[in-house]
Amino acid sequence: MSQASAQHTPMMAQYLKIKREHPEVLLFYRMGDFYELFYDDAKRAASLLDITLTQRGQSAGQPIPMAGVPYHSAESYLARLVKSGESVAICEQIGDPATAKGPVERKVVRIVTPGTLHDEALLDARRDNLVLAVHPQGDRWGLAWLELSSGHFSVLEVDGESDLLSEIQRLDPAELLAAESLSLPPALAERPGFRRQSDWLFDLESATRLLCDQFGVADLRGFGCAHLTTALTAAGVLIDYARDTQRSRLPHVTGIAVETRDEAVVIDAASRRNLEIDTNLGGGFDNTLASVLDTTATAMGSRQLKRWLNRPLRDIAQIQSRQAAVQCLIDADRHATLRDALKAIGDIERILARVALYSARPRDLARLRDALNALPALEHDLAELDEGTAIDALKHHIRPYPELAETLSRALVDNPPVVIRDGGVIGTGFDAELDEYRGLAEHAGDYLVELETRERERTGLVGLKVGYNRVHGYYIEIPRAQAREAPAEYIRRQTLKNAERFIIPELKEFEDKALSAKSRALAREKLLYDGLLETLNVDLQALQGTARALATLDVLACFAERALALDFVRPRLSDQPGLRIRGGRHPVVEHVSDHPFVPNDLMLDETRRLLVITGPNMGGKSTYMRQAALIALLAHTGSCVPADEAEIGPVDRIFTRIGSSDDLAGGRSTFMVEMTETATILHNATEHSLVLMDEIGRGTSTFDGLSLAWASAEHLVERRAFTLFATHYFEMTALTEPYDSVANVHLTAAEHRDGIVFMHRVEEGPASQSYGLQVAQLAGVPPRVVARAREKLATLEQQEVHQAGTRGGLGDSDAAAPQQADLFASAPHPVVEALEKLDLDAISPRQAMALLYEWREQC
């Protein structure tokens, strides 16, 4: 593509010039009814889209690879390209082909990237689609992220790569921007949608100036972020990127929200994955916490719900305000009414973003019209609710817009077409000029019949006809025999063998109007449509405030509905540390299970900070632990919780070390992954943290694993973190001896013949046995193997009993004690071994005294 322009046709020279300005993206070059791609773009698109790769003549002596997609169905192809991680520059014809000398003028009108989508067809309606920029300063990281399709713009600063990774995992951006020279962890640099930006763009002064221009302010102090210099640098790069891709000043991005880590319950990346908040371990949505809770009436409510679940609050006043709002909706029995009203609202948050970007389609405006018409009834319903809850702050924003509603109702037909280009969007009676053009185009036939009848009567020429052809336009045709009698005002237009054709001033005037009526109607309709967008943009900020308030109301109504439908209870929020749960349940397991869920109690307080949980595999240990974390999480979002009763103290972090998996790409074994996650917990857990530790130490030798598990538990006891510690090392149950704040609980099971019945009930004390062979039998291990395992187990247990007897005569130990070797039992001391072997009757008193002195030295 570097050949001189003279070697190319004018059209191809134009293409190459535009392509040079956008080398890193695919270029959709508009030619008539197609978007064409050339050269390497064509090859890549043909491969990704499975479309035909062809050629378009030659340029510079070489065949030009070409591929294309129809203009009218471009969205589906764009969706596939974006899903593949591609970005696409849309180059449109902006000149008039009729008047163009040479190639029609074209320019790139926007760049479609994974993180800057706003077209409805390209987005997941119920998930945020973010573009995020990062910038470091020492160990401090600044993050800025934008949801272009709604206008949400936020910043945050964190310390260290661990917190950075945690926040990026929470936000899950579709695109990630960073400086070219910045060294990033592989987990970020290898993310889909990762984009490098020029280093010089990351400049605080330029960023501040750009942000002030975006928000129309002199400085950023009013947003409470002027001190966040690292995050603001990232924010400036982000706004510049979004403006460039959209070719717009982004009028719907009117402010910036500041987040801090201290405001929310921190959930690190591993814990978020293990809890399956809105993404399951397979990367899907099914069987997640959000899948059970999300009965929101609108897509914007669904997105808000996921934000709340992924960022539980710590401020008790805010949480209680939400709780009170949910309780108010339940008590007033209004949640169902409100949810029905909200269904008529739709996703106006994203519609308004498209309005701001002048990309809203006719059906967007029709949905907005319907939403505005639904607001008066919704306002009335809210007015009847009690004061003193989170709903109070919403009432100010959820209000009617009668003038806008009336304008849209008059302007739009009931069911407009998908696009404006073919007309039929603006209703009759809204604009007299448009009605006139349409009348001319639609009723031309009626006029011609009426003119023909009138002229026959006026002239007396019974053979007179009015007609039309593409070459000569409209005409009055008179048979040759009667042509001499044509009135003087008839102007001859065409002579035929058997007739003469004439034009008259009235018909000429009609012709001028009729032939251009359709194009004029389309142009007028487009002008009126743009006028509607301008009118809506005047009230854009207020409308955005209404949309956000409606999304919040939707979540609160969803919480109320779920509380009633799933038998959730309002938790008490306490300033006393701990979790006190009676009849707690796992919300997801209960929802998807075909069997009744067995509820269990949980007591963690100042005197009981770590529970050692034992019991058989499949007995429910992991479920019991996860439900505790999910109940704490839900309580901090303001939701009711799955329990008979719950009192939740302050929680600053939720940690989980559950499950096992290799990190093959990162070159880490299962055990390395486990130890990395454990290290994060041990370094960061506080006295207000909730920690779930499941089967620590499984990936190494028994002695190493048990030692690590014991030491980790001791460390958590010393840090006073609230901990649920599940283990198959029965020696761990001895932690209750040195530590008063440790207690034992176990999941019950009962043997039935050669099988096992899991009771899923949590009881005090350690488990009596592991039931490993019974679980193996349930799993389908061959009977011969299970039988051989039983034989081996009996041998090992007999050896253990014998060894215990020789060590200290413990053969009569408590029958309830687990039959498992005490791996922490001390090895016999050399003095003890010598004493055991000594024949006391065969030595003299002097020899006995000498041995005592020798043994004392050894001790």
Swiss-Prot record:
One of its GO terms (molecular function) is ATP binding. GO terms for cellular component: cytosol. GO terms for biological process: mismatch repair. SMART domains: MUTSac (SM00534), MUTSd (SM00533). ATP binds at residues 615-622. Belongs to the DNA mismatch repair MutS family. HAMAP family: MutS (MF_00096). This is DNA mismatch repair protein MutS.
